[in-house]
C-alpha cells in the first residue's frame, strides 16, 4: 500500500478545485435542494453550474475541475508511485480494452479518500444539475496511462460498471496525440490539464485515441 509523499494530496478539501467551478457548485446547491423538495412535480431550472459546464455533444460535457497546481503535484507523485506500484491492466476486461492503471482504493487509499470527497461535494451536484440524478458512490477511481510501450490507444467500448464517467487529463502538452472518440459524434482533442470530460459511458460508445509519444496520464 502506497503512502503519499505530498500530504496536500490527501487533504479532503476544495483547495484543488477550480475556483469558478467551486463557486458555481456552491451557488447551485439551493436549487438542487429545492428541486428534490418538489418530489419531481416541477422542472429543474438552469443553475449556476450550467454557466461553467460546456456541452460538446448531446450528453457529453466539459468543465474546468482541478487547478493546474494540483495536477502538477499529482504528476510528481505519480513518479514516486511508479517506483512502488506498477500500472496494471484490469484482467476482468478483455485485452483490447485493458488500460494500464493504478486503482486508488486498493493501492493509494489516502488519495482515494480525497477524490471520493470531490465526487461527493463537487461532481455529484454537477450530475444533479445535468441529469437530476445522484451518483455519489464511484465504482472505481484510478489513474490511467496511455503510452507507446504499454498501451497507446483504447478500443470501442461501453463502460459496463459505470453510468457516468469523468475523465481528467493531468498533463496535456507533455505528450503527442491522444484525445477521445465518440462513435456518433467524432473526435475530441485532449482537453486542457485539469478539465473534466463528463459523459454517460454506459450508453456512449467511446475510445481513447492513439498516443504518438510520451505518457498521457488521466
What are these regions (language model features)?
Residues 117-218:
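Catalytic core of non-heme Fe(II) oxygenases with the double-stranded beta-helix
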Residues 1-55:
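Intrinsically disordered terminal extensions flanking catalytic oxygenase cores
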Residues 17, 24, 57-58, 62, ...:
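Short, functionally important structural connectors and interaction interfaces within domains
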Residues 31, 35-133:
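Non-heme Fe(II)/2-oxoglutarate
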Amino acid at each position: 500500500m502506497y503512502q503519499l509523499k505530498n500530504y496536500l494530496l490527501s487533504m479532503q478539501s476544495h483547495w484543488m478545485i477550480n475556483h469558478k467551478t467551486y463557486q458555481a457548485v456552491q451557488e447551485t446547491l439551493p436549487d438542487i435542494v429545492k428541486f428534490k423538495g418538489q418530489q419531481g412535480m416541477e422542472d429543474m431550472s438552469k443553475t449556476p453550474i450550467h454557466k461553467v459546464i460546456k456541452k460538446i455533444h448531446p450528453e457529453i460535457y466539459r468543465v474546468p475541475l482541478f487547478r493546474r497546481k494540483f495536477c502538477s503535484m499529482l504528476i510528481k507523485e505519480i513518479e514516486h508511485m511508479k517506483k512502488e506500484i506498477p500500472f496494471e491492466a484490469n484482467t476482468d476486461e478483455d485485452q483490447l480494452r485493458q488500460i494500464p492503471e493504478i486503482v486508488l482504493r486498493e493501492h493509494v487509499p489516502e488519495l482515494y479518500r480525497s477524490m471520493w470527497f470531490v465526487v461527493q461535494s463537487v461532481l455529484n451536484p454537477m450530475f444533479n444539475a445535468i441529469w437530476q440524478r445522484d451518483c455519489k458512490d464511484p465504482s472505481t477511481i484510478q489513474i490511467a496511462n496511455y503510452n507507446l510501450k504499454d498501451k497507446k490507444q483504447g478500443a470501442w467500448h461501453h463502460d459496463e460498471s459505470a453510468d457516468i464517467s469523468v475523465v481528467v487529463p493531468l498533463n496535456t502538452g507533455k505528450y503527442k496525440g491522444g484525445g477521445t472518440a465518440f462513435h456518433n459524434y467524432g473526435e475530441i482533442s485532449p482537453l486542457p490539464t485539469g478539465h473534466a470530460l463528463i459523459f454517460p459511458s454506459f450508453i456512449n460508445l467511446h475510445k481513447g485515441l492513439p498516443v504518438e509519444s510520451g505518457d498521457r496520464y488521466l
